[in-house]
């Protein structure tokens, strides 16, 4: 017998979707409105965040609390990419294995910060971690 999800669980699912939605809209704003071209790692992170927005929206609509089964793998992979990107930004990854080319956008330039303080790769990592935590909480609330 599965535990019945409460209204609080649905609110957590909605919050999870909102985090993904805000992340997606922010990435689109930075790229399309501000005109900042994403680097290679940003594209890969987008490939994992953008589908989460759609998947979690459908899960909210259907009250599908098993969404963690297919959203959590995307989140973990996206978080791993964001972690590598954050290490790259911090200068902890050696130069020879940096994925950005000399002709493409820089992963570690000054334009990769929010308000000149918070690195965008760290924000992406934070968003993926928050989504993962919320999905795990949803799983624990709905799985016996």
From Swiss-Prot:
* GO MF terms, alphabetically ordered: protein-disulfide reductase activity
List the disulfide bonds in this chain.
Answer: 39-42, 100-107
Q: Which Gene3D superfamilies match?
A: DsbB-like
The UniProt transmembrane annotation reads 10-29, 44-63, 70-87, 116-138
Q: Which SUPFAM superfamilies match?
A: DsbB-like
A single GO CC term for this protein reads: plasma membrane
The UniProt entry lists membrane topology as:
Multi-pass membrane protein
Instruction: Please state the protein's primary subcellular location.
Output: membrane
Q: What is this protein called?
A: Probable disulfide formation protein
Tell me the lineage of the source organism: Bacteria, Pseudomonadati, Pseudomonadota, Gammaproteobacteria, Pseudomonadales
């Amino acid at each position: 017998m599965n535990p019945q999800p409460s209204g609080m669980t649905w609110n957590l699912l909605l919050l999870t979707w909102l985090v993904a939605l805000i992340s997606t809209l922010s990435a689109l704003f930075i790229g399309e409105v501000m005109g900042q071209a994403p680097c290679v790692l940003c594209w890969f992170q987008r490939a994992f965040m953008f589908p989460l927005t759609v998947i979690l929206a459908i899960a909210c609509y259907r009250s599908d609390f098993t969404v963690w089964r297919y959203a959590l793998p995307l989140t973990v992979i996206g978080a791993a990419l964001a972690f590598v990107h954050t290490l790259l930004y911090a200068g902890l990854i050696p130069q020879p294995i940096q994925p950005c080319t000399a002709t493409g956008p820089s992963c570690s330039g000054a334009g990769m910060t929010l308000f000149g303080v918070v690195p965008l790769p760290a924000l992406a990592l934070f968003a993926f971690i928050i989504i993962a935590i919320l999905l795990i909480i949803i799983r624990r609330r709905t799985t016996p």
